[in-house]
Amino acid sequence: MMPQILVDADGCPVVDETIVLAKRYGLEVTLITDTAHVMNREGATTITVEKGSDSADFRLVNLVRKGDIIITQDYGLAAMVLSKGGHILNQNGSRYTNENIDGLLMSRHIGKKIRRAGGRTKGPSKRTKEQDDRFVYALEALIQEILQIN
């Protein structure tokens, strides 16, 4: 069975790049978004869920099949997807794996504790073309690995 690509599309800067690559390899793309981020893109199916804490995440997890590719920057969602045998990339092309997810979840927890105590943590920088290029390269490599294309 061909993998599908599921995108946690709320605030995702690489939706268009994902659709272009998926089309090249004949893969289906599904965008999962909540009502605050309604989007429709040619070449992708869009599922819109009610706005609410993690409702898009739970919908995405319910759609995941072993071997699917998921695009998200959410560590909690990534952990759930890993347990179902999915492959996860973030918007910068970094892979979330069983080997690195615990450390990522711990750093998220520490950051939350700092913010809760009144501290500040560094926010994201302005997105660059290099980040987009790195994502496209990583997604294509992952697709080729899964489809066993040399």
Where are these regions (language model features)?
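Nuclease catalytic cores that cleave nucleic-acid phosphodiester bonds
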Residues: 2-150
